[in-house]
Amino acid sequence: MTDAYSYHQRILDELARHGLKPRPSSSPQQLRDAVRDLYKYEIKRLRDAYLAGAFPKRDFAGQVIELRKRYPLLSIPTELWTR
């Protein structure tokens, strides 16, 4: 039998910001992995933009911080995602 997960509304809202709408059978770890993959994609794009000269080095750290703020789920343990 597959586990059914009941997510806190705050977690569902954050997942929706990233285009994710979990099913009851979607495990927190699967969802965290998907969010992490999105973050990794965006951080690589940011790095590539920096290397292409889109912005100066002094702005890179600030942009990384702003990107990280869009992914608060990565700092919340998955054990706290469900009721």
What do these predicted regions represent?
Residues M1-V35, T78-R83:
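Long, non-catalytic architectural segments outside compact domain cores
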Residues S25, A52-K57:
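Charged, low-complexity interaction regions
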Residues Y39-R47, L67:
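Non-transmembrane amphipathic alpha-helical segments
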Residues K57-E66:
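Short, charged, amphipathic alpha-helical segments
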Residues K69-W81:
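Amphipathic alpha-helical coiled-coil segments
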